[in-house]
Amino acid sequence: MMNATTSSTEERLSVGNIELEVIRRGVGRSVLLLHGMQNIDPRARFLDLLGGRAAMIAPSHPGFGHSARPADFDTVYDLVHLYLDVLETLPSERVTLVGLSFGGWLAAEIAVKCCHRIDRLVLVDAFGIKISDRETPDILDVFNTSPQEVQRRSWHDPGKWAPDFNAMSDDELVVRARNWEALCLYGWHPYMYNPQLQRWLRRITRPTLVLWGASDGIVQPSYGRAYSALIPGARFELIAEAGHHPEIEQPEAFVDRIVAFLDQ
């Protein structure tokens, strides 16, 4: 399969003395895409499909991919404030914000703080809230679960889509390790959620689509339904035969759902 952490893209974006590697695709309506637990492979099919309908920019978060992380940059709120700055640099007055997995948490936080720069919001298998009791985990602890089990629960068809680490280049392996380290730094405690976010999701006033892989074993569809119910007017949709990465396993269905939402 296509690995999820290929070599650096050529483009860079400088914001507030932080330099981010970015992927750009397409023309038209502006879309800011925030990646999940791994940075986005520029060969991913969904990029070209979505780029056929929108002008998309997909940065690698500081510490992920080939984006450097400043020494004092270590919380989700550093990321949120960075992307608030990124929104101010984009030429469009309003953009569609799409967040995948961990990036969905960031997107929700940004939308709570800054709806005036957002046209529409798409959350895809997003982290960020706590819906169960204190003793019941909502999100699989990927750091304390065997790699084999993480892969099994990440994909509808892991035999087809799980990354082959033996086939990765040295650069890809280094990037994947950097991604894992950065994810742990930003999201370890509390694990992948903000205790206050659930209360403030009511502040999101822009049209919102919550997309979920029907076979997601990292964070179950029931979590996605609960997430959607906390955002006024949000719509929840499942993508069949997809796990935690519907943009990879079902790129056509993923893009079709987003384009239909944008066209409404």
Tell where the protein language model's regions lie, with residue ranges.
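Acidic catalytic loop of the alpha/beta-hydrolase fold
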Residues: 215-219
